[in-house]
């Protein structure tokens, strides 16, 4: 699996959501991207979670904006007036992650937008697998674009990788925070989702996704045993 690499050419505006301070930027392919910076929040681990979570979702046939690697030149942002943003840009020199910007998309609202029980069950199954704590009624991290449901923002997934201690034990523990999932009340076909997705999400597919993680996002070389830990989990 090959992700495209493009260069950031224009910083448009910050998207002040959560602690990661993503931004809207334009790249040299003339497309706009939501940039996830390596210098923000949980750093490169959040970017790795974004990549793995987004590409697993795509492999399961969910709609996910294209994920690209974004190269940030060291001179970029020197004229930025906001010191916090200027610091963030300086700390994020090099390789970052971007999601194709879906212009005109609306934030999913369960009161306004309806999803069928099959889709709801499949999204809940995905987030239980990813241990994604960030798809709640307060922050759905889903968009409606051209009347279709899109999944975004998986940077809070795979939280086990912030501490490798006892990851084998964590892997078999129930994911209790799934109780807060925005679509859980509608997810009445979890067994069907489980049966279907287990056939699609093979070890080979997971290996292909984790192989796409560049060493540069890890600050150190990723050993093969470490790279395989998300697969084992």
Predicted segments, located by residue:
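Conserved ATP-binding subdomain of kinase catalytic cores across diverse folds
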Residues: 2-110, 120-123, 129-133, 146-148, ...
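Phosphate-binding glycine-rich loops and adjacent basic patches that engage nucleotide phosphates
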Residues: 10-20, 82-90, 168-173, 194-203, ...
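Helix-boundary and loop/linker segments of multi-pass membrane transporters
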Residues: 113-116
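Canonical protein kinase catalytic loop motif
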Residues: 136-138
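Catalytic-core segments of enzymes that bind and process phosphorylated/nucleotide-bearing substrates
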Residues: 141, 147-212
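Short helix/strand-capping connector loops at secondary-structure junctions
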Residues: 210-223
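Residue-level detector of conserved catalytic or cofactor/ligand-binding positions
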Residues: 220-233
């Amino acid at each position: 699996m090959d992700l495209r690499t493009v260069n950031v050419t224009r910083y448009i505006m910050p998207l002040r959501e959560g602690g990661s301070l993503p931004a809207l930027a334009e790249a040299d392919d003339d497309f706009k991207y939501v940039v996830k910076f390596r210098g923000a929040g949980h750093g490169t681990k959040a970017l790795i979670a974004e990549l793995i979570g987004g590409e697993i979702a795509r492999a399961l046939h969910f709609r996910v904006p294209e994920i690209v690697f974004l190269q940030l030149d060291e001179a970029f942002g020197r004229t930025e007036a906001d010191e916090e943003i200027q610091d963030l840009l300086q700390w994020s020199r090099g390789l970052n992650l971007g999601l194709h910007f879906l212009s005109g998309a609306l934030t999913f609202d369960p009161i306004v937008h309806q999803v069928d029980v099959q889709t709801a069950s499949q999204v809940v199954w995905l987030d239980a697998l990813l241990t994604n704590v960030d798809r709640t009624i307060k922050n759905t991290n889903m968009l409606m674009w051209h009347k279709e449901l899109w999944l975004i923002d998986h940077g809070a997934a795979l939280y086990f990788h912030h501490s490798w201690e006892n990851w084998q034990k964590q892997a078999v523990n129930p994911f209790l925070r799934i109780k807060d999932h925005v679509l859980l009340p509608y997810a009445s076909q979890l067994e069907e989702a489980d049966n279907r997705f287990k056939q699609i999400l093979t070890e080979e597919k997971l290996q292909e996704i984790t192989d796409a993680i560049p060493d540069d996002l890890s600050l150190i070389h990723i050993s093969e045993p470490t790279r395989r830990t998300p697969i084992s989990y």
